[in-house]
Amino acid sequence: MTTVDTILAAKYPAKAHALRVSESLKARHGGAGVIYLEAQKTRLIEDSDEDMPFRQRRPFFYLTGCLLPDAAVVYDAVKDELTLFIPPINPESVIWSGLPLSPEEAAKLYDVDRVLFTTDVNSTLASIASSHNGQTAAFAIAEQVSEGTSFQGFAETNTTSLKTAIEETRVIKDAYEVALLRKANDISTKAHVAAIHASKTATNERQIEAAIIGACIANGCREQSYHPIVAGGEGGATLHYVRNDVDLVDPVTKQRKNNVLIDAGGEYQTYCADITRVIPLNGRFAPETRQIYEIVLQMQTECIAMLKEGVCWDDVHALAHRIAIRGLLKLGILRGSEDELFEKRVSVAFFPHGLGHYLGMDTHDTGGNPNYEDKDTMFRYLRVRANLPAGSVVTVEPGIYFCRFIIDPILKAPETGKYIDTEVLERYWSVGGVRIEDNIHITKDGSENLTTAPKSIEEVESLAL
């Protein structure tokens, strides 16, 4: 067994998470008597008798490690006692779906003190309130409490603070969570390699997407962290491209497109990988793509080298822009001085998004405190506005894009158009976009890259040939 598999052979650390959330609530509110959370409900597709695809509620999973629908959990913070509630057996459901998990089986699977049926929720809450002499508060999430659930007997029912406490606690991952993220990355790396192999003969983006999803499922990620992006040629200039069904042969030139941008990651036990690579469709990168790729790889390499506990994410993002400016100046796409281009925010036309985001149970994980109202366009879409704590996991995903919709207004504005050489720029529209994205675990003195998907030009071309 690998180190990751050894760690994951243990139970998901639900009680440790419950304690951390309780301590967060205590720091803000003087203590939590009880925490109550519900799993996602079984829901039907509109106008159908088919179940909707199931996605577990993240707050519930964080305190249970349980993927069952229609369940609940209660944490008695005074006794440090975690109780999981699972649905009772429905004889009619057994006919179609088989026997559900029993309380005894659930107790062996999950890091909880006891397992009861959901029919016992109210009596359990009442018993806890009584044992606390009505002196403690109950915490829940307002929109995630079923009708009929009663918090009678508690001094207060707070439905506003728990969500924030969980989201802030989730920023710092424990060793088990890092192992889950590493596992998701390992499987997703296999998917990206499968995508490179598929690209050799693929005639349409969807064939590459199929290879990604198939490799993820075959290796243990039944779900994708997000809708995969498979963008050939100029499609790579669209940040969240969703078509994935365009032919890879240019309809005008009848030539195979130069490259394809792939942004895809599998979800393993609710934990996400988020990886982006650009691969050549003709075995080797076209000269213009190669030049942009080298700049983006340098942006990522230098930004990752800067990472450690306490680093300001704004500063890392700014470094990425400066490296982009230097590279585009060298190619002749930009003209002027580095400082002037930086101050005028000209590079935002080519690198319009943030450098990355927290990663965990959500692709854009909680706790980043972005400011989408920021008047500074360089930082408006930065999803993390903080000094990075040790234990956090971030994506580092610089990119350079040639999107006419974004660049044209900059070209037409007299105060910024003078900084771009349109004749040189014309050679790069076919590149579309280059983004390189890895998942980085922040440590006290540096960082650890969880992503092993090939990314050097030599590695990628050797697989693509």
UniProtKB/Swiss-Prot annotation:
Its EC number is 3.4.11.9. Its cofactor is Mn(2+). It catalyses: Release of any N-terminal amino acid, including proline, that is linked to proline, even from a dipeptide or tripeptide. Keywords: Aminopeptidase, Hydrolase, Manganese, Metal-binding, Metalloprotease, Protease. Binds 2 manganese ions per subunit. This is Probable Xaa-Pro aminopeptidase pepP. InterPro entries: Aminopep_P_N (IPR007865), Creatin/AminoP/Spt16_N (IPR029149), Creatinase/aminopeptidase-like (IPR036005), Pept_M24 (IPR000994), X-Pro_dipept-like (IPR052433). One of its GO terms (molecular function) is metalloaminopeptidase activity. Belongs to the peptidase M24B family. Mn(2+) 2 binds at residues 263, 274, 437. The keyword Nuclease does not apply. Gene3D superfamilies: Creatinase/methionine aminopeptidase superfamily (3.90.230.10), Creatinase/prolidase N-terminal domain (3.40.350.10). Catalyzes the removal of a penultimate prolyl residue from the N-termini of peptides.
